[in-house]
Amino acid sequence: MYQSYPQQQQPGYQPQQPSHPIVGAGAAPTMAPQNPYGQQPFQPQFQQGQYQQPSGQQYQSMQQQFQSPQQQAPTQPTHPDRESYQTALPANVTPGWNDPPSMLPSAGTTPNRLSNMRRRPVDPSISGNVGYGTSSQTSNPYGASASPYGAPQQNPQQYQEQPQSYQTYQQPQQQQPQYGQQQNPQQFGQQYPGAGAPHQQQHYGM
């Protein structure tokens, strides 16, 4: 790959070099600056091609290096592993040391024993399924209707308090248009077009 490009460079540069004396004396100064400019872009192009070649070969060689251990890594350990499973055990090792326990003869007894052992002890004072279904409402310390967060009747009171708090904040705003600043009620009316508070401001102001 390296030899092909210099062979192309030599015939390419040879006709350009004798072209200087062949051309007339008047055309020589005009062609002379053009040829070095023409040669300069050619040189980096060939150099880039030369640099690309070893890079490609390096990548190929690296790929070969990476591929070779990948191919060797699975092949080398797999064969002794397969052979070790197939080979007989030494005399010191008992034949059934690693066999799983046979679950067929004791299949009916062991799961019941395990379930009985894992079950938590039950208090005799507890009767029925406490905490499941409808019986959980009766065992509520807060009562069947009440919730630990409070009675549901407090929610409408909270919603009623909110407009009152808005009115308290809007009362100092009512004093502003009385002093002649008429832009503030217009701005608040634009910000809250659907609320009834700006209408209340006008009634209070009147």
Curated annotation (Swiss-Prot):
**Low complexity: bias regions:** 1-19, 33-76, 148-194
User: What are the boundaries of the region Disordered?
Assistant: 1-206
* Composition skew (Polar residues), residue ranges: 126-142
Q: What is the protein's name according to its record?
A: Prion-like-(Q/N-rich) domain-bearing protein 96
